């Protein structure tokens, strides 16, 4: 939940056709057969006859730390009755497991020191020197290479988790989900391995989206170009020639007629969808109890969702998408679009001196500082970019039309709608800020921060659920609150 406060004379009501519960969705997750594991390391001696019982029998003279058996937990969702029943492998950008177990080491005792000096051969693919000491992977017990997706893991578990999430893989355990994960069993049971990854704190939202990867490449390219320009300047380039070249590039960078029409259409829809100013004024002018503050914030969020639905319906090409894809895009982007709109209001719409007052009132609404601090940090980082309303509108549309949302059936169709928006945004950045070639990459980089807020929002929902806070039917629908 986040704070929405913007001027709108007439908030719009959501169309009945968009009241669609998550239980009505056709969850189409590709079923993938587990690949047969192959031992990557060559061993000196023959393996034992029974690999299931003695997987390390070739190492008779070496002592290994004992693995603490991990008890498979039942579905967390079914225990709290918070979200609909889904497989544990299922992830959605707006819905995450709400419990993250601490990355505790699975090993009891200390490894015995061998007096004979032994030179260890580095694992292939491991990043030597990234961590101190012989830290162990919290998933399988192999040598860890660093913190990957929020957990200390080896390169193998890092790659396995990334592939499993990006491909929406669904695995099946032959032992009823009771496998004890170690370096041998990780090759035999992918379901238990993926579950162990999640139990140890690995987060799906830490994976970069296609847009975020593009942002990283842009930052790298910009740095290379900047270094090259400095080198050329040091060799005697005339400063006036550089200024002339910059001016020439700015003149050549302009929107095509089709891009101008697209931008006008987006801006017309974005500017019409505003939230009632009286809610914000009420929140700032009067001081309420924590419960009353929560009710006001709920009203703001409801108004935001109504505005978001209307804006989304008017995005060019959105109505041509499959109906289930439309709902998946709307639900998947609701939290991110909400935070982005709030950042615009925080940086541009609030009167001078009201930002600190707003933060103070929100902290008194019962929301933990654990969520409020990164939220306002994000608002301030966005304000530093000095974004125009055109950039806010385009970035919001890009967030909504993200082809990597869960349960999108026709990702190519969504990507075709998103690409023209990215092109227009990139050109606008060159036109408005030619002296700052990194501006476009910085805008896309904010999408990385937005993805992390999905998890914060899920945690907030859980804490409010425990405290028996009530939500409007619209928020229950869009956030899948039962």
From Swiss-Prot:
Residues 229-240 have a biased composition (Basic and acidic residues). GO terms for biological process: cell differentiation; inflammatory response; innate immune response; intracellular receptor signaling pathway; negative regulation of inflammatory response; negative regulation of transcription by RNA polymerase II; positive regulation of transcription by RNA polymerase II. The keyword Plastid does not apply. The modification Phosphoserine is found at residues 145, 164. Keywords: Acetylation, Activator, DNA-binding, Immunity, Inflammatory response, Innate immunity, Isopeptide bond, Metal-binding, Methylation, Nucleus, Phosphoprotein, Receptor, Repressor, Transcription, Transcription regulation, Ubl conjugation, Zinc, Zinc-finger. Residues 134-209 bind DNA. This is Bile acid receptor. It comes from Bos taurus (Bovine). The modification N6-methyllysine is found at residue 216. Belongs to the nuclear hormone receptor family. NR1 subfamily. The modification Phosphothreonine is found at residue 452.
